[in-house]
Amino acid sequence: DETLQCAARSSLYAYGEEIRQGFLTVQGGHRIGVAGRTILENGHIKAIHPITFLNVRFSHQMIGCAAKIRSILTDPGTGSIRNTLLIAPPRCGKTTLLRDLIRMVSDGEEGKDRGSALTGSFERPKAGAGHENKAGKMVEMRKQHGGKVRAQTVGVVDERSEIAACYQGIPQNDVGCRTDVLDACPKAEGMMMLIRSMAPEVVAVDEIGGENDLEALRYVMNCGCRILATVHGNSMEDIREKPGLSSFLQEKRFERYVVLGNRRGPGTVEAV
């Protein structure tokens, strides 16, 4: 209890809703997971008391960690980010990578060569007979955008205050100069709010899962916005078995899937 009171600056009551969900996020984006005896009301968790177990996760930003995959996730013609889903088990760097992608898209940065040693070559095959016109248009579009990620307005729904690490409404992490943040807001409601009020070109959310999240994603995509999202899983096979998400994947709304692991440390890109 003393540790929690210290982390919450003696205002533990202000974190009641977060604690009910099993965590609290403190200044700097650091998250403290809590466990103990749950108190139920009408079959739902009302509170956790006493809290007897803690798990502290320290947040840290890695500027530039998304540079290795940004060209793969960028449309070469428009410079826009593609609809992307980051897949990783806990503690494998998906939120860190998402945060840097948000910063990159918001500020706009030059892309890298498409060839990559991460998962093999991502070079487009050379145009064969009958494809000269299409190849020529692609070259012209690449020249037009100069291989850059175009700066775009980004709306972030930061339900657990881990992406932007807002303190008194101000992001403590660098999420770009064109980014608007809804802090401590449920994902599904937040996505709808951003579309209606902030006119984002890209919407970013962490750890999607529930049916409400997926319905909100459909709405956002149908409005013409791009999506950057993450989900827990070890592989594509894992997430295809998740209820609700499997049918969503069959709609082929995401253009890129990035699987992360920790084979060579957190944030290792296993497949794209």
Write out the residue ranges for each language-model feature.
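Conserved P-loop NTPase
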Residues: 27, 41-49, 256-272
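Hydrophobic anchor at the beta1->P-loop junction of P-loop NTPases
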Residues: 86
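The conserved Walker
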Residues: 90
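Conserved lysine of the Walker
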Residues: 94
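Hydrophobic positions on the alpha1 helix immediately C-terminal to the Walker A/P-loop
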Residues: 97, 101
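P-loop NTPase switch/communication element
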Residues: 106-111, 146-187
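Conserved P-loop NTPase nucleotide-binding/switch module
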Residues: 171-172, 198-257, 262
